[in-house]
Amino acid sequence: MPLTLYDKIWNDHLVDQQDDGTALLFVDRHLVHEVTSPQAFEGLRNSNRKVRQPGLTLAVADHNVPTTDRSKGIADAESKIQVDTLESNCKEFGVQYLGMNDKRQGIVHIIGPEQGFTQPGTVIVCGDSHTATHGAFGALAFGIGTSEVEHVLATQTLVQKKAKNFRINVNGKLPIGVTSKDVILQIIGQIGTAGGTGSVIEYAGSLISSLSVEQRMTICNMTIEGGARAGLIAPDEKIFEYLKGKPMSPKNENWDKAMKYWESLKTDDGAKFDKEINLVAEDILPMITWGTSPQDVITIDGKVPNPKNEQDEDKKNSLERSLNYMGLKADTLATDIKIDKVFIGSCTNGRIEDLREAAKILKDKKKASHVQAMVVPGSGLVKEQAEQEGLDKIFIASGFEWREPGCSMCLAMNADKLKPGERCASTSNRNFEGRQGRGGRTHLVSPGMAAAAAISGNLDDVRKYQN
């Protein structure tokens, strides 16, 4: 019987299955950070258990770390406790830890691929919803809760039920100024935040194949905002080339063995999907979110929706609530929305290609005087690469702050946050109420669109700044 990519990875990791569909899956890779792991390690300690396979877990501090001068340590007491606790837990249980001052430190979903820890055909879990990012490598990757983190540490397995197969085909070529961030925002706008519920999404089509590894990571990263359990893209030569020579990638004959398996990781012709939709790349435009859900998208040349045009009373009330929280009036042009801050970074758009995209727009230009703008590289290695290319100088010359790596203003768990009423053009993944700080207002955009907004002081069309 023809199988999907998801079917193949699932079957290869099945330890046991009950009659009701409950299954036990082997977990190849476990990523850990400081926020969702303390109780898990404490549970092991209280039960007198060890980490079953310490070499299959990699830990890093990313959520709470400061992005300003780290020589002063962590000012917030609670954040310091979480980071210190992760370090001591990793020492006690023999887990590799990339500390705050390790140049390899960064956002968990960026450092995994950088180190070659992320590999095709593996099951990867992390106590973090954006674990789907690693699906860009043809891995089955998804977020888990703290009790599940403990279960994986103790057993290297996880109890799951198989999801449905959902394929999204995107064919064609993207117009100038349109990026993979716009593609995933368009998809979420189309299917809604519940559109992928109970499914694993495989992204396919000529556009997906043409994307770089990092662009694919952006798409898989936001799969969770479309309600799905995980997002997958079949691995190809771009993925193999990316992983070759990485510190934790297979070496010598192990590389040859791995390649043999990796090359088999594709959906068979004739495999059945429970749901399938098609998009045309040429129809996608630069996107922004206007409201308080990732499905609240409009094109940059569009208008904020008007609740009066909505027949459904619940949807009408929801629109009114979002408009009220966001401080927007119905029918406002997207380009008339004034912003206060710009944030370029996160596990969605904090990689080197994202920084290049923004720097290209900002070169020889200045940000608007009223805008506070920051770039937070996704890892120490991204920061180092950007500095070698002189991107930091472009950002600083245009008036941006050049920061240390971490999650930063994506979720405002460190000092980087919006004040009540402040409006931000952000390259992150969530625009919920209070996500970037209590009362903060978030508009999700691509790195190029964030740069354009910084220059004009309003949400703006990146195509104006491109040849």
Curated annotation (Swiss-Prot):
GO terms for biological process: L-leucine biosynthetic process. [4Fe-4S] cluster binds at residues 347, 407, 410. Transmembrane segments: none annotated. Its EC number is 4.2.1.33. Keywords: 4Fe-4S, Amino-acid biosynthesis, Branched-chain amino acid biosynthesis, Iron, Iron-sulfur, Leucine biosynthesis, Lyase, Metal-binding. It catalyses: (2R,3S)-3-isopropylmalate = (2S)-2-isopropylmalate. Pathway: Amino-acid biosynthesis; L-leucine biosynthesis; L-leucine from 3-methyl-2-oxobutanoate: step 2/4. Its cofactor is [4Fe-4S] cluster. InterPro entries: 3-IsopropMal_deHydase_lsu, Acnase/IPM_dHydase_lsu_aba_1/3, Acoase/IPM_deHydtase_lsu_aba, Aconitase_4Fe-4S_BS, Aconitase_4Fe-4S_dom, IPM_dehydratase_rel_enz, IPMI_cat. One of its GO terms (molecular function) is metal ion binding. Binds 1 [4Fe-4S] cluster per subunit. Catalyzes the isomerization between 2-isopropylmalate and 3-isopropylmalate, via the formation of 2-isopropylmaleate. Heterodimer of LeuC and LeuD. PANTHER family: 3-ISOPROPYLMALATE DEHYDRATASE, HOMOACONITASE, MITOCHONDRIAL-RELATED. This is 3-isopropylmalate dehydratase large subunit. The gene is leuC.
